[in-house]
């Protein structure tokens, strides 16, 4: 946590952050762009501490990136008119139950995030990390000005899985799929 003191644009989310659209093991390209590792971090609106840290980090990234945001223009656009990564799930994803009563941040990186468990031991089993788990994320915010688009973006540093959750995206777990079939072998043999 001491790194966040020296870096005002870095945030460690709370442990009740849910991961969605989790591409932590393999970089994926969107619309032919650069392949990136990414995750949508769903943050409950009740996690006021994490939301406060994210808002402060976005403001710090804005201040640090004023020259970049100004570009060739005469003035720096106000933060309120820029695209920022903290979005309201109730507004932008009203039909997705996973985003209800939550904010979300899409974080990405061209380099793979470090992934550890609750005891900070590396997770090597890819099936342990999926869309729907809960955990912390180390993220950083930075200003961008590219092809006329200006704003604040979110970089993905590392992930810490805290606990399992219901898989998102319709994927079921093998343990759940076959839970009701456990006693059927006896019928087959008799």
Indicate where each model-derived feature is located.
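OB-fold ssDNA-binding interfaces and closely related basic DNA-contact patches used
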Residues: 1-104
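Acidic, gly/ser/pro-rich intrinsically disordered tails
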Residues: 1-9, 166-190
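Beta-strand elements of well-folded, non-transmembrane domains
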Residues: 43-45, 141-143, 163
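Short intrinsically disordered coil segments
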Residues: 55-60, 119-122, 170-181
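Beta-strand/loop nucleic-acid-binding surfaces
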Residues: 106-124
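Exposed beta-sheet edge/beta-hairpin loop segments within beta-rich domains
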Residues: 118-135, 142-152
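OB-fold/S1-family single-stranded nucleic acid-binding modules
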Residues: 146-166
């Amino acid at each position: 946590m001491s790194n966040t003191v020296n870096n005002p644009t870095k945030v460690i989310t709370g442990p009740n952050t849910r991961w969605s659209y989790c591409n932590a093991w393999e970089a994926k390209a969107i619309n032919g762009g650069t392949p990136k590792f990414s995750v949508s971090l769903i943050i409950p609106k009740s996690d006021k501490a994490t939301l406060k840290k994210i808002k402060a980090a976005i403001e710090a990234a804005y201040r640090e990136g004023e020259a970049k945001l100004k570009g060739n223009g005469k003035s720096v656009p106000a933060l309120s008119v820029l695209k920022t990564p903290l979005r309201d799930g109730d507004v932008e994803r009203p039909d997705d139950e996973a985003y209800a009563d939550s904010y979300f941040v899409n974080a990405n990186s061209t380099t793979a995030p470090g992934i550890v468990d609750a005891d900070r031991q590396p997770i090597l089993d890819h099936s342990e990390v999926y869309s729907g788990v809960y955990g912390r994320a180390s993220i950083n915010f930075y200003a961008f000005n590219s092809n006329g688009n200006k704003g604040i973006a979110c970089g993905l540093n590392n992930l810490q899985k805290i606990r399992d959750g219901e898989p998102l995206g319709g994927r079921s777990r093998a343990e759940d799929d076959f839970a009701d079939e456990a006693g059927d072998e006896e019928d087959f043999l008799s």
